């Protein structure tokens, strides 16, 4: 029986990995092991070597306090791979962790077939990483159509498979969703996403909550706030910040429903912005990192925007409030402006949809099936 070792370090990778594992096991008996979240564990019928929350860290300086623990986890993962002797190693995103594991494994198992899913953003910064990946991996799966040339020119086999959000089922009946959640027709619904990392949540709550309060002051009882959560532990982190708020709020564990039912979203930068746009909901994006991390990012990065829709469109389709502009007054003013300006909202939705179509939204591109086909035909012979 063939054995595949998967590694995913965050929720989006777990989602993509779960889909691929299900497809692979549909017509072939395989043993799946590795590191993943609930989706991958259920699809592969395995127990993760350790919880993915252990490696779900972001930012240069945010990682420093955990660096020795992360090194131990890297070494633990490498030894587990060596002990299990898989036929294929498949890593998904989380480059800070997965690349280091793959590099160490390559030294000890030079013949092992290795695939990485989610190309590192070399078009944004550190283009030299492409050559480093070419030395380690046999194949790279890219989510964006313009990425393969960056890697093929340095000798790495890179295939465009499309973005995983393209195969999700999005909700379109806002009226039915409002009835399901018992939300009045004239109540404005604001969706607030805080991220999947504890550090992100703690960093953004002190900014987002005052911004929401200012919006509430204009709408009073006609405002409902939804916090979509991926992890029940996050509810425990958030609740202390909400003890004295004046606005009504609910927690939801169905993020796509949360996006679709909302009139507007205040979103942290990330994959969630594509899902919100695909749900037909306008948004603003706000994000803040450690100041030292920000300085390093600004020195390295060569793109103007952080939101993928803006990056591809090369203009600010979705308003961004990043770092020093991630400030409650600025955020609340823009939220109120969008709530009162349907023309601006319609323009954002229309332009976002055009960008999503460029990415294959509502097309016949099914990333997990394309990935499965390549793995099955070329690596599981």
Swiss-Prot record:
A Pfam short name: LpxB
GO annotation, cellular component aspect: membrane
E.C. number(s) listed in UniProt: 2.4.1.182
Keyword Transmembrane among record annotations: no
Gene Ontology terms: biological process: lipid A biosynthetic process
A molecular function (GO) term: phospholipid binding
The entry's keywords: Glycosyltransferase, Lipid A biosynthesis, Lipid biosynthesis, Lipid metabolism, Transferase
KW Lipid metabolism (keyword) present: yes
Top-level taxonomic group: Bacteria
Catalytic reaction annotation: a lipid X + a UDP-2-N,3-O-bis[(3R)-3-hydroxyacyl]-alpha-D-glucosamine = a lipid A disaccharide + UDP + H(+)
Pathway(s) served: Bacterial outer membrane biogenesis; LPS lipid A biosynthesis
Role description: Condensation of UDP-2,3-diacylglucosamine and 2,3-diacylglucosamine-1-phosphate to form lipid A disaccharide, a precursor of lipid A, a phosphorylated glycolipid that anchors the lipopolysaccharide to the outer membrane of the cell.
Sequence similarity: Belongs to the LpxB family.
NCBIfam families tied to this protein: lpxB
Protein name per Swiss-Prot or TrEMBL: Lipid-A-disaccharide synthase
Source organism: Rickettsia bellii (strain OSU 85-389)
